[in-house]
Amino acid sequence: MPALACVDTSFVPPAYAFSDTAGDVFIPASSPTSAAVVVDRWSPSLSSSLYRIDGWGAPYFIANSSGNISVRPHGSETLPHQDIDLLKIVKKVTGPKSSGGLGLQLPLIVRFPDVLKNRLECLQSAFDYAIKSQGYDSHYQGVYPVKCNQDRFVVEDIVKFGSSFRFGLEAGSKPEILLAMSCLCKGSPDAFLVCNGFKDAEYISLALLGRKLALNTVIVLEQEEELDLVIELSQKMNVRPVIGLRAKLRTKHSGHFGSTSGEKGKFGLTTTQIVRVVRKLRQSGMLDCLQLLHFHIGSQIPSTSLLSDGVAEAAQLYCELVRLGAHMKVIDIGGGLGIDYDGSKSGESDLSVAYSLEEYAEAVVASVRVVCDRSSVKHPVICSESGRAIVSHHSVLIFEAVSADKPMVHQATPGDIQFLLEGNEEARANYEDLYAAVMRGDHESCLLYVDQLKQRCVEGFKEGVLSIEQLASVDGLCEWVLKAIGASDPVHTYNINLSVFTSIPDLWGIDQLFPIVPIHKLDQRPGARGILSDLTCDSDGKINKFIGGESSLPLHELDKNGSGGRYFLGMFLGGAYEEALGGVHNLFGGPSVVRVSQSDGPHSFAVTRAVPGQSSADVLRAMQHEPELMFQTLKHRAEEMMHTKGGSEGENEEEEEDDEFNNVAASLDRSFHNMPYLATEQASPSNSLSAAISNLGFYYCDEDVYDYISA
């Protein structure tokens, strides 16, 4: 059988050729050196296009001239010197304390309260403009649904930033209503506290207590039976309630997030139930308490046409309630204001929306105005529960790719493959078929014969006929053939120091996609494509779907000797729901969290609060284990083992045993105290376990005096 040096060059990629060897086997030649490869010039603007940063990131994220991602904390109003470089934040936060850093470990959530403030102001401005331009005779007064992100400082910031325009909160459970009541004590007295969700007597009593505390609570009826409790408890507590009701509209959102809409939605009252509620309130002398109509088409409403249909239907229902004698004042359009996760500005999927904030507000105001004018009904206050649109942009998850597995082609020698010609006849026949297909340039047959040869050789390996080295040679040969015909999988697997289940649960649970981008090296051309594999022992702990319909992500090669530094990736637009939904699969706890404000320092930012991620002791305690007792048990076992070694005599041996025991105890102590994630750099010396457990472990300073940790 002749060698395959004469294969048609149109069949073989330029980087490969078949060597003319002395035997009746063919093997791949080495690829040309990298010196022969022409590297195109690259720039941050090309990376911005590649990763669609100008689409999903506008106006808060850009690729700066240094090749790093910068945050524009005030959106389009951000001045050039106010941009905040994400890589500088990472270096500040993860740097050792001895060098002025905070010594925190990745993964890391970075919160930008300035972005949060800007999102609130933009939402309010959009409605204010639509109301003024259309001559609408009322105002907009939104609420933030705390379920999106219940973090104390996020909720407190929203109340503070929105106080001047009476921005309120929405709660859907008893803990959430307690949280909201406490926070709104520092907000506007006119701000709404919208009480949604399933309710029992205790929940309703809390809402009524809120009115006694001069909070503007509104009890929204999700189920007809709740009305009896509201009437009974309000009379017992001598509180005149403000009541709303949630309607099941006929308008339905067809996407994934539309399952809560339509007549079969989880929450809300049908038209029949609404009529019964009105009658019962009239009979109880409480029809004047019914003041708010609430509905929810679904999250991520894709287009203003669907939005307008739903709002118009609800506005007609609002007018009917006015006609029936209810003292209606507010129409609560619920959530649904979407964001552009993939930068496409399209209404064709759940990942994007075909409108801007301004267009959304214009559609809502116009729909309510037209219907109310037609029925000669006074324009109501417009309320929305736009959580995703408010908090998604303000938070960035940063994590590290610690290693990469890339497909390797085994460089076989003639001797490696000679066994195919000397051994099993079926294996030889499979090899000869593959040889002939390669000579013909028959790609389809190559795929078939590669599969047959591999299967035959695997059977031989299972029977003990082939060695592991021989099986590896066959695998290498087959992979090379696939690569030569363009059928191999060139995708690398990047191992990331993260748990998908803890930090990006929606990706695993509902296939929600988020923009994932390197936060640096954007001035360099990506040299590979990769998928991301997390730390968990779970096959679902991977990211192999990306925005733009891609099954892999352009990434930079990791430097093997470490001279290129660490490689950081950012997951963006995840400020809503991800933290609230995250679990502790494999006992990987929550990431470190820092709060970063724009400042006039040399690097434009200051860390105003820093919280280390959950330690191993923290997550063990969350699962009802007792870290202190576990530590003492292991320490006692170590002490026993040291004393039962035997054969040690003299002071020196005893000192060595004591030193060994102390080292073991210290190692155990550190393991409980440190985060469960990989320690990719030398960890800072830990405090004792007992001190770590009793201490909340956060750094904090008032924003007015944060210079001591300004960058």
UniProtKB/Swiss-Prot annotation:
Residues 642-661 are annotated as: Disordered. GO terms for molecular function: arginine decarboxylase activity; protein homodimerization activity. It is found in: Plastid, Chloroplast; Cytoplasm, Cytosol. GO terms for cellular component: chloroplast; cytosol. GO terms for biological process: arginine catabolic process; polyamine biosynthetic process; putrescine biosynthetic process; response to abscisic acid; response to cold; response to jasmonic acid; response to osmotic stress; response to oxidative stress. Its main location: plastid. Its cofactor is pyridoxal 5'-phosphate; Mg(2+). Gene3D superfamilies: 1.20.58.930, Alanine racemase (3.20.20.10), Lyase, Ornithine Decarboxylase, Chain A, domain 1 (2.40.37.10). CDD domains: PLPDE_III_ADC (cd06830). Residues 650-661 have a biased composition (Acidic residues). PROSITE patterns: ODR_DC_2_1, ODR_DC_2_2. The keyword Chloroplast applies. Disruption phenotype: Increased levels of lateral root branching. Required for the biosynthesis of putrescine. Catalyzes the first step of polyamine (PA) biosynthesis to produce putrescine from arginine. Is a major contributor to basal arginine decarboxylase (ADC) activity and putrescine biosynthesis. Accumulation of putrescine plays a positive role in salt stress tolerance. Accumulation of putrescine plays a positive role in freezing tolerance. Production of PA is essential for normal seed development. Controls PA homeostasis which is crucial for normal plant growth and development. This is Arginine decarboxylase 2. It comes from Arabidopsis thaliana (Mouse-ear cress).
